[in-house]
């Protein structure tokens, strides 16, 4: 299976060009991380893959499962160091109110951004973040 990741990296520029792709979503990078038992190999392969995406010139969104021990980190703690932005999507529960969807921007490289957790919703038109609202 690891050879297929190398193959995808090799085919990526051609596929991006053939589809005229400007954006790419990979759900989930956690599956790629699980392909490698060796931590050093995992880190190298994921680094090479994310570099290939950047070189292909597409805006890329990677989803990742959170670590069980730290909900603000990816399972293997690699991807957040290789990306330009990290967004944490979570459910926020309150004893007295309904569960809300919340987004927190952990990092956006070379940009100032809010450090506040904000409510959001996903609609047929995309994602809406309620910048002026608070969670509860």
Describe the role of every protein-language-model region.
Residues 35-66:
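Substrate-engagement module of ASCE P-loop NTPases
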Residues 2, 22, 39-43, 69-76:
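Conserved phosphate/pyrophosphate-binding and hydrolysis machinery centered on Walker-type P-loop NTPases
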Residues 1-36:
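Conserved inter-motif catalytic segment of the P-loop NTP-binding fold
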Residues 13-20, 118-136:
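NTP-binding/hydrolysis catalytic cores, primarily Walker-type P-loop NTPases
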